[in-house]
């Protein structure tokens, strides 16, 4: 009986209904599976790999058609299985071939295979995989039998099994993907949404301040993608301080993207608070432009290039470097020394790589930004214990040490001369910097410790024991660390741009997802509100409530064109040649009218009507669809009564012809 149905009731290959397309997709899948089982894959691995690829493509096509049936039968998302968990998945997981990969994985797990390096997870989800494959095989048999009976109807058994399979497949998708890749937790997802809200507010504020134009957003200019994270750091620390960049809370409460830069963000926030409105505007401008136009004065700064090229001014530069380092706190000096020697520290690696700037003195920029609060942190540390200064061996005043340090000046000069005379290919910049800075640090430490011992005694009576050092920052003291206003703006630009660039590099998928949320928002479906809180009575009034109006909105679906019945047309619509045994009727898939073979010999794909592959269309529709400067509507359509109604283009042409006559 099944064979006779296949012969007489087999759907047409060009039928756009989902059940008809499922029949041919399922038949192709069975053919590939039979061919794959008919030979030994170890003898011909290339052919086996090619067949496996074709099998996964065929499985993916079958699942897409089943999904289309579910959408057609249950248009509302709440009637189908919930898949909101997909927002926790990485972007590289969500693609069109995911259903086919899940089916293939379920087949492998059902056969006894394990996920590589995930044997425990494989044993846990194996029963669910068997249920999915069993339900899918049963559903395929039901759909294939129904496609041979009536491709346009769905009985209650099919509807029930479609929903059952949808729920099983959604549950298997979550467990399988969770076993394969790390999935975000609820807290991490909420933190990512907070960052999206911050960037959205930043984009709106940037439009108000004319830092970003609407044209740049419409054209998706790369400068917008670069400027939004940079401005987000500035305004997230100043304007929206209680949002995603609230550094007053522990680092664990921040987003995963900003957590590695917690200490650096605190220091950037403190520097941003001492900026004047003019300086803040200048900083925002240079962050949007992508480059700092602030000239840097290096007359009092010793850089690495001075050791290599400035032989005549070596002594002067060396003395300036000593004076500058003696003025710095001991914590800052030690941190600067360790930042040159040990590049594995978090903020130092950021300074040496992402915060690198073509401007001279960039090494000093990062070191001073990293240690801008050296005095305050040292104060807070020393105030926690009254005996710390006296007990520490480094803080004991030793005149012999001072004399010894003073007597070593000649050794320092000799060491610098030897370092300068060595070739660049034998001694690197890092070695030169570490040698010089170690000696200079020893010379300045004794004088610094003498001042610190006297200063700690007075600080203990001013700052309480449990006071946070960050709350005692003096704006004047911070500003005095920089040579000028331009120097402060430039150093902030280097650090903020470096953090933003690190976000773009290390968290590219998260940044891309956040930018997609704010630059390509989801379409908002309008909901009609009830006026004056009056609920309509469906029996007496024709007015609908807001929920009813929302449910009756038109839903996107593939709708076919109504065809002209064969008995209503005895001749070709284009050439008016009568149909006979030789000249057969052909329907145009675009307009639904009947033509002969000569007038409908063209084929083209019509995705909006459900035809993904090429189908037959008449010559007129073919020309109109290929003409990019013309309209794509059919020349005429068929109304509900079966009568041919001319299109707008034909009506305008007829009116023009009648007016000219």
UniProtKB/Swiss-Prot annotation:
GO biological process: negative regulation of epidermal growth factor receptor signaling pathway
Keywords per UniProt: Metal-binding, Zinc, Zinc-finger
Compositionally biased tracts (Polar residues): 297-310, 641-650
Biased composition (Basic and acidic residues): 412-422
Keyword check for Zinc: yes
Tissue specificity of this protein: Expressed in vulval precursor cells (VPCs).
Region entry Disordered, spans: 294-432, 641-661
GO CC annotation: early endosome membrane
Pfam families per UniProt: FYVE
Protein origin, superkingdom: Eukaryota
Low complexity: bias regions: 330-360, 381-393, 651-661
Biased composition (Acidic residues): 394-411
InterPro entries: FYVE_LST2, LST-2, Znf_FYVE, Znf_FYVE-rel, Znf_FYVE_PHD, Znf_RING/FYVE/PHD
Sites where the protein binds Zn(2+) 2: 588, 591, 618, 621
Disulfide linkage: none
Binding site for Zn(2+) 1: 572, 575, 596, 599
GO molecular function per UniProt: phosphatidylinositol-3-phosphate binding; zinc ion binding
Entry annotated with the keyword Zinc-finger: yes
Disruption phenotype: Causes ectopic vulval induction.
Zn-finger (FYVE-type) residues: 566-626
Family, similarity comment: Belongs to the lst-2 family.
General function of this protein: Negative regulator of epidermal growth factor receptor (EGFR) signaling.
Protein name: Lateral signaling target protein 2
Source organism: Caenorhabditis elegans
